[in-house]
Amino acid sequence: MTDVRIKIIAAAVKCFLVNESDTLEKVAQEAGVSRRTLHRYFKDRQDLLESCKNEMLDRCNKAMTEAYESENDPIKKVKNMLFAAIEQGANYSFIKRLYERSSFSEVESRKEFGSNNVKSKWLTIMKNLQKERRINDELTIPWIFNLFGSIIETSIYAVESGDVARNDSKTFAWTSFKGAIGLKE
């Protein structure tokens, strides 16, 4: 990716995080380029939003992979992955508002859902914890997956609305998630 393209995407993220309806003119101004230059790299607003979404997915995947690899204990892996997803989600929350979160069946059927995929690793941890009876076996994995996503969204929303401090939101999210799935640490 060229430096100008990266700069435009960063400017778009900054603008849209504050105001989803900011104009491309405002994004160009924030990036320090002309609108014409912006259109050399992005054909329209939707193209720019797609690029922001892809950037978010790449960064979130990277952060969650790092969180996964940072620990050997599966519970600490899940906790760190939750925190990484909250951090990345907070940085790109406008994307979540513009694109609906995928359902479990859509995620599971995608080609990207391979053995190296961070979601696959997360799901494997959940299945293993369930087999070990460390989490409630009455809950299905799709339910737990959607619950995980909902807790991330709730954490982000609570911080954005000013109801909860950013650091507290992570503690509350982890307490909520482990309680909801009956996690035995």
Q: What residues fall within each predicted segment?
A:
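Alpha-helical DNA-contacting segments of helix-turn-helix folds
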Residues: 47-56, 92
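Hydrophobic alpha-helical connector segments
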Residues: 51, 65-91
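Hydrophobic alpha-helical segments that form the core
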Residues: 136-158, 168-180
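Short linear capping/connector segments at secondary-structure termini
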Residues: 98-106
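C-terminal peripheral helix-coil segments that are non-catalytic and often amphipathic
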Residues: 120, 124-131, 161-185
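Amphipathic alpha-helical packing segments from all-alpha helical-bundle domains
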Residues: 106-134, 142-150, 157
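Basic, helix-initiating cap at the start of DNA-binding domains
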Residues: 1-18, 24-30, 47-50
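Short hydrophobic/aromatic patch on the recognition helix
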Residues: 33-42
